[in-house]
UniProtKB/Swiss-Prot annotation:
Residues 96-113 have a biased composition (Basic and acidic residues). The keyword Manganese does not apply. This is Uncharacterized 13.1 kDa protein. Its main location: host cell. Signal peptide: none annotated. One of its GO terms (cellular component) is host cell perinuclear region of cytoplasm. Belongs to the geminiviridae protein AV2/V2 family. InterPro entries: Gemini_V2, WCCH. The lineage of its organism: Viruses, Monodnaviria, Shotokuvirae, Cressdnaviricota, Repensiviricetes.
């Protein structure tokens, strides 16, 4: 947990509130299994709080709120059935094909005849 005697305080009251909210959500995140919907929603809520741009934070919050309203309390502890492809969280982006160049053909070994 954050120790106020060791670390510096944020510049504003809003910054302090955001920091305390994130610390609480990180503690709450540990109560959910990593592959559950509840864990994913808590991570989305942390990203809403960390957004620096108002428009980006509002967009993330609407995405979070629609996912929360569409799920029941029992579903929060269930494993996620289909992966999320939201553009704002890099943990959901697929990493396949990132290390290959786009227009390079693969060479094939040909046996000597």
């Amino acid at each position: 947990m954050w120790d106020p005697l060791v670390n510096e305080f944020p510049d504003s009251v809003h910054g302090l509130r955001c920091m305390l909210a994130i610390k609480y959500l990180q503690a709450l995140e540990d109560t959910y299994e990593p592959s559950t919907l509840g864990h994913d929603l808590v991570r989305d809520l942390i990203s809403v709080i960390r957004a620096r741009n108002y428009v980006e934070a509002t967009r993330r919050y609407h995405h979070f709120h629609s996912r929360l309203e569409g799920s029941s309390k029992a579903e929060l502890r269930q494993p996620i059935q289909e992966p999320c492809y939201c553009p704002h969280c890099p943990r959901h982006k697929s990493k396949t094909g990132l290390d290959e160049q786009a227009h390079v053909q693969k060479a094939h070994d040909v046996q000597d005849v």
